[in-house]
Amino acid sequence: MAIANKNIIFVAGLGGIGLDTSREIVKSGPKNLVILDRIDNPTAIAELKAINPKVTVTFYPYDVTVPLAETTKLLKTIFAQLKTVDLLINGAGILDDHQIERTIAVNFTGTVNTTTAIMEFWDKRKGGPGGVVANICSVTGFNAIYQVPVYSASKAAALSFTNSLARLAPITGVTAYSINPGITRTPLVHRFNSWLDVEPRVGELLLEHPTQTTLECAQNFVKAIEANKNGAIWQLDLGQLIAVEWTKHWDSHI
């Protein structure tokens, strides 16, 4: 999918990976980039507008843990303004296994609810035009960082949800793929809290191994958007973009 002239909603588009990805997106010339984030950052919004003045960059405060009805109401406002939305990026995430319920609420339930809400406007069974969902999951959805089992499980759940969305595309008209970054140097990594403090130095230990920058991750993210492959499981690790071939161990046969 060419980004040029598209309308894009980016949930958590001002975070570490999110902000660099927003920068790369506006360089590609979308018509509108709507950023939904819990914390306002006027400086970052101004920077994004300055990168490409032809792009309309809009900010709305949004917490992914709000009830589904509130998300639907916000999206109704956005759709009334833009008329159409081509791509939804779900990027909200926290990494703190001390906060079990919030980790699940942000990393998994928030992704599900935001996606469910936009189906009201996209689902072809309701006369919608369809759309594309890009969910930021994690390589920990493939193989857990066992010291942060809650985070890893929440990302595995988001990945499974995304894979199901892709399979439902013939019914809904909505395609989906997952973005799975490896260890990326962001403030999130430095604030690691392991489950029950089983490894207080988990963040430090991870950073002792090869990592990638947020810019490297963002540049590959844009390549994945442009590829627009329904059902793709993209691994963004060490500055590389890799299409993961998922091994099927069981099939429901329905």
Swiss-Prot record:
Belongs to the short-chain dehydrogenases/reductases (SDR) family. The gene is Adh. It holds the Pfam family adh_short. PANTHER family: 15-HYDROXYPROSTAGLANDIN DEHYDROGENASE [NAD(+)], ALCOHOL DEHYDROGENASE-RELATED. It catalyses: a primary alcohol + NAD(+) = an aldehyde + NADH + H(+); a secondary alcohol + NAD(+) = a ketone + NADH + H(+). PROSITE patterns: ADH_SHORT. It comes from Drosophila borealis (Fruit fly). This is Alcohol dehydrogenase. Disulfide bonds: none annotated. Homodimer.
